[in-house]
Regions:
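Catalytic binding pocket for nucleotide-activated donors in carbohydrate/polymer assembly enzymes
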Residues: 145, 259-335, 340
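A nucleotide-sugar donor-handling region in carbohydrate enzymes
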Residues: 119-188, 212-213, 328-335
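A short, charged/proline- and glycine-enriched loop
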Residues: 2-8, 96-97, 170-174, 200
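C-terminal alpha-helical cap of glycosyltransferases
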Residues: 344-360
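A donor-sugar binding/catalytic signature common to diverse glycosyltransferases
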Residues: 81-83, 90-101, 239-287
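Short acidic-hydrophobic, aromatic-tinged amphipathic segments that line or gate anion-handling sites
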Residues: 60-65, 234-238, 304-315
């Protein structure tokens, strides 16, 4: 029996890191394998974060910026510090603690790979394909294939989804999620009366956190707010920070080229990829190379996982076809989901904790 214990700090620079961190934290507690503290950064949503802290009973501290977080880490000297992205003081961390990078998604942006240019002690990776790519790009660094821990709660039956009645929706209707990313996004390509076209369905709208919090996405917020007035729509609130209960509830996902597509496909549910995006002028025409540079070559794999809609006008027909035949693309969907996000057996978090204990 392993009697080792570890101390962990989870660096929560963004609220949307939590759905990836929490399954690891819960596994730590389940194995009675140590103690964890969550490091939150003050911002515009502190009140909502305090509610989450209370509901999850998280040991935590607040910091104002990364410099203050770094000072805290130097004082605490925990065994492992988790980061969801790059950290400017990472070169100082090895003197005090070991570090982990655990990405918050498995989307097609090139930044998935380039954020390993500043190495942590270990980066936990989703699947053999991504692990091998990263090892080829950064041969001197440490990458460990564990799978995608964010979905562990669904696979293990620990997340049951929403009560549609409590959301004011109809239980007899099929339920769609529209989960667009912030940029490049399809939101502004959808009409103002979008929910009317899908009135026979419940619609859960789960935008990216940046769409709801950053000033430059004001037009997106206006549309989202307008759609929320329809009877068949539930718009995620700030404290609905995780996509997981939305995925557990819905029958079909509509999204841009985002991590959500792979996550939902792994649950063997139909996915529609909106390939009609609102691009800034400096990403169009002669500047289209910037869009291609932003997206990784994995972008091309999305047509194997999801049914592609090249215009809003195509969407209604494709949705109806996929709802009527949800398993039509099942074999291909699962094959490519496993390629891009690894094994979905509900044990990714356990593999992470075992690694941390064995490499303390």
């Amino acid at each position: 029996m392993n009697n080792k214990t570890i101390s962990i700090s989870f660096d929560v620079q963004q609220l949307y890191y939590l759905p990836q961190y929490l399954p690891v934290y819960h596994r730590l507690l389940k194995q009675n394998a140590g103690h964890a503290t969550f490091v939150f950064y003050h911002g515009i949503h502190d009140a909502f974060i305090k509610n989450i802290i209370q509901s999850e009973n998280l040991d935590h501290i607040w910091v104002k910026d990364k410099a203050e977080a770094n000072k805290y880490y130097k004082n605490q000297k925990v065994d492992w510090i988790f980061f969801g992205n790059t950290f400017p003081f990472l070169n100082e961390i090895p003197q005090i603690s070991k570090s982990v990078q655990l990405g918050h998604g498995v989307g097609p942006k090139a930044s998935y790979y380039t954020k390993s240019s500043t190495p942590t002690t270990v980066r936990f990776v989703e699947g053999e394909y991504r692990t091998n790519r990263l090892k080829n790009m950064y041969p001197n660094d440490n990458f460990v294939n564990v799978g995608f821990c964010k979905l562990d709660p669904i696979i293990n039956g620990e997340t049951t989804g929403f009560d549609l009645n409590q959301l004011g929706l109809k239980t007899e209707k099929k339920t769609l999620i529209y989960a667009p990313t912030f940029y490049p996004s399809s939101i502004e390509r959808f009409p103002k009366n979008f929910p009317e076209s899908f009135s026979t369905y419940n619609i859960l709208i789960k935008p990216h956190y940046f769409s709801t919090s950053k000033d430059k996405y004001k037009k997106q917020r206006q549309l989202l707010s307008h759609w929320s007035n329809y009877d068949n729509v539930y718009l995620a609130k700030v404290d609905d920070y995780s996509l997981v209960p939305f995925m557990a509830t819905a029958d079909l996902l509509i999204s841009d080229a985002s991590s959500a597509i792979i996550e939902f496909a792994a649950l063997d549910k139909p996915v529609i990829w909106c390939n009609f995006l609102k691009l800034r002028w400096n990403y169009r025409g002669i500047f289209s190379y910037r869009f291609k540079k932003r997206m990784d070559k994995d972008y091309n794999e999305y047509s194997n996982i999801a049914v592609r809609a090249d215009s809003y006008q195509e969407l209604k027909t494709i949705v109806a076809e996929q709802v009527a035949n949800p398993h039509a693309l099942s074999k291909t969907r699962l094959q490519y989901a496993e390629k891009l996000a690894g094994t979905f057996d509900g044990n990714a978090s356990a593999r992470i904790i075992d690694y941390l204990l064995n490499n303390k």
